[in-house]
Regions:
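A short beta-strand/loop micro-motif in the catalytic core of glycosyltransferases
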Residues: 51-57, 162
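Catalytic donor nucleotide-activated moiety binding site of glycosyltransferases and closely related
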Residues: 24-32, 60-64, 104-105, 110-147, ...
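Nucleotide-sugar donor-binding and catalytic loop/hinge architecture
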Residues: 18-20, 87-99, 242-243
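Leloir-type glycosyltransferase catalytic cores
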Residues: 142, 196-243
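Aromatic- and Gly/Pro-rich donor/ligand-binding loops
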Residues: 1-45
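A donor-sugar binding/catalytic signature common to diverse glycosyltransferases
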Residues: 154-195
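Acidic anion/phosphate-binding donor-loop and adjacent secondary structure
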Residues: 32-38, 80-93
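Donor nucleotide-activated moiety binding/catalytic core segment of transferases
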Residues: 72-80, 84, 131-132, 136-164
Length: 243
């Protein structure tokens, strides 16, 4: 929410409407490793009023330190604070057969090509969540403007997920899916997805249209999420309770 690419300087994201004594961030994301020079002074001004900083990726800790001289903590994205069992309660799916799911934050021909290649290898159909004007490709079934329940269901019931989206990565992890993630994009590198997977010990990066299907130890991954959830909730309780 602190990415200059996404929000510019909408005051709401920096809590300028609130008293400084009430300003805390939780899992805020800059989405980039460094700020362009033209944003630095404005970010310093906006952030210095916060009491505590929580960010989504380690690079955010570094940015907060550079901008404010203070320390930030890295915590889980809110989607990961909710268990898979809870998400399953709202999940709805109209697809009754195994499939490969594509979900992209922006159009990516490389992901489509990778998914189609995977489709041939696994003999599975490909479905793509398509809210934006993505290029239409033959051999792909499109899911247009799903409801929240249908969106969650798309990930819950997929056999494989191919994505370049942070939340596509997050929901794949929540449901322990066989995932393939492209970090590189037109805007640079998706440090949010990269940071999440590295913190969980998952190596599934698509590079030049290829990705090794390395084994994922989901027991270890789920243990790490459980431990990080406890730390994240303790942080939230520290100021919600007046700490």
């Amino acid at each position: 929410m602190w990415s200059p690419r996404c929000v510019g300087f909408d005051p709401a994201y920096f809590l300028t409407f609130a008293d400084d004594r009430q300003k805390y961030s939780y899992a805020a994301s800059f989405a980039i490793p460094t700020l362009p020079d033209e944003f630095i002074d404005e970010y310093k001004k906006r952030l210095n009023g916060f009491q505590k900083f929580s960010v989504r990726e380690p690079s955010g800790e570094k940015l907060v330190k550079e901008l404010t001289g203070r320390t930030a903590e890295t915590h889980l994205d809110p989607t990961l604070l909710i268990s898979a069992d809870e998400w399953k309660k709202i999940a709805v799916s109209k697809i009754d057969k195994p499939y490969i799911l594509i979900f992209t934050a922006n159009p990516a021909v490389s992901l489509v090509d990778f998914a189609l290649k995977l489709s041939k290898e696994k003999n599975l159909p490909v479905y793509c969540i398509n809210d934006a004007p993505h290029p239409v490709s033959h051999g792909i079934n499109y899911i247009v403007a799903p409801t929240v329940e249908e969106f969650v269901g798309c990930f819950k019931n997929a056999e494989y997920v191919v994505t370049n989206s942070f939340h596509g990565t997050a929901f794949s992890v929540i449901f322990n899916k066989n995932l393939f993630v492209e970090f590189k994009n037109k805007s640079g590198r998706n440090i949010r997805s990269e940071g999440l997977l590295k913190s969980l010990g998952i190596d599934r990066e698509i590079v030049d249209g290829n990705c090794r299907e390395t084994e994922i130890n989901w027991y270890d991954v789920n243990e790490k999420i459980t431990n990080q959830t406890i730390i994240s909730l303790d942080y939230l309780k520290s100021f919600v309770s007046g700490g």
